[in-house]
């Protein structure tokens, strides 16, 4: 890091303590009798105090099992929470399309819409509303990309309450309780202490 500070070192120590205390934690894949694709996307708007860039994250589940996830600090500054969430939605739709193509090649894809969960109603409204507003002109390409997938029935957007948002742990720091709840939702277990 080019401008490391003591808070960065504290964050590294926190991560190392977590990893040391959870050596057997990993993903458990279960057969759930279906291969439905669901995904969650989230963004933490203007979270970086240095440059006000946002962090976006997503999780993709196939058959209830976590198969893909990403957390990334974005290279641009968003003007609103809705814009940050909408750009995160665009990233997860791209990933869901890749998963869809993989399942198609494996001949296991069911012809049902893949659900994308987002906790920002404004971002969902932008996707469904074909009218371009001055405040969303700069996300026009993402709008047409998502709108095309909605209209063709490939994806379906749904609202999830913040408490049910699985991608929260990829965009912001969580307390111990919230982290454990989110890890359980992702299918993570501790092989040394199974529940």
For the regions a protein language model found, what residue spans apply to each?
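Extended, low-complexity cationic-aromatic segments
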Residues: 40-42, 51, 168
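Structured nucleic-acid-interacting core domains from mobile-element enzymes and related host factors
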Residues: 17-43, 108-110
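Short helix-to-loop capping/linker segments positioned immediately adjacent to catalytic or ligand/cofactor-binding
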Residues: 3, 25-27, 47-49, 105
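Hydrophobic side chains in beta-strands
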Residues: 29, 39-41, 62, 90, ...
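RNase H-like nuclease module associated with reverse transcription
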Residues: 35-36, 54, 66, 72-195
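C-terminal reverse transcriptase regions that engage the nucleic-acid substrate
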Residues: 1-26, 161
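Acidic, metal-ligating active-site segments
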Residues: 44-64
